[in-house]
Amino acid sequence: AVIIIFLITMLLVCGETVMAKERLGKPLGVLANGVEDRVVISWEPVKKADGYEVFEKAEGEKAFTKVKVTKKRKIVLKKKARGRRYQYKVRAYRTKKKVIYGKFGKKVETMTAKDSTSTIKNFLTTAITPVGSTMYIWGGGWNKEDTGAGKDGVFIGLNPNWRNFCGKQKASYNYRRHRYQFGAGLDCSGFVGWSIYNIMKTKDGKPGHGYVMKASKMASSFAKYGWGTYKSATGIKDFKAGDVMSSSTHVYIVVGSCQDGSVVLVHSSPAGVRLSGTPNRQGKAGGEAVRLAKAYMKKYYPSWYRRYPSCGKGMSYLTDYAQFRWTTGKGSVLDDPDLYQNKTAKEILQDLYDKK
């Protein structure tokens, strides 16, 4: 009887060991972007996975349907209905004696704009995807010649190396020790250029192309492309979702403004890609925007927040930056069917994070 119990115990232990070895992780960094009549879905690779299954649920449908089985880490679905919302989820699988499935990654949503390339919400959804998992790297997103986008600046989805590098850093992280460590993270203009590339394109691009440029030139250049309007720092009256704000030393994206005049923004600034808040219109620190940024960083990025809890920025973010604002509507590059440009930062953050 003792021998039988011992054998059963060993079988159970061995069985658990085999299952542990066979267990697959869930895909991280899942991102979906509607680009005209196409949807590109990307994710970070899962260790030991042989492939991935992608499921879709279109607006008005009750259940998810499998739409693709692939060995790659990104796919493009073509000829999608315009002006429609789509949800996606991805899981990894491994084929041994039988097929083993991992858990689904985070469910994501995008929209194919009816008459535009993309939407303001798609832009902000893309911009917050690397938050909390991507460090600030001086030169990150640029080419070695420092003349334009490098591989990361024209990369569809998240580079898994960003998360790997981020996970090894401590609260004492000093970006000066990692200058031009290409592939490890993004600097301010590399981040903005990467965000725009991902709402405009569906395939990785060639270094030297894309939308990475000096921070000081971004707002004026995007206006010259015909995407929207430009205002110098002295002419700015308000801040709206999706605004790109340029100065001689930095560039950031507006998430939304608050009733006290403070602004929630997303940017790559030491230590990395994160949400931050400005003072209110009277210059008082610790206003609504900072409270919102802290609350969302603490809730959704706890590991990052424990290491880098600072979320406040100075008054210069409201006074010293030129502004680019997307023109929306029929025939524009970005449309705003979600009316983000008319919503407060609180409403936008709730929609981006809480309504999943």
Q: Where are each of the predicted segments found?
A:
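Recognizes extended acidic, P/S/T-rich segments that occur
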Residues: 53-83, 95-99
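N-terminal capping segments
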Residues: 115-200, 319, 323-356
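Glycine-rich catalytic cores of cysteine/serine-nucleophile enzymes that process amide/ester linkages
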Residues: 133-147, 173-178, 246-303
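...with weaker cross-activation on analogous glycine-rich loops/strands in unrelated enzymes
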Residues: 202-280
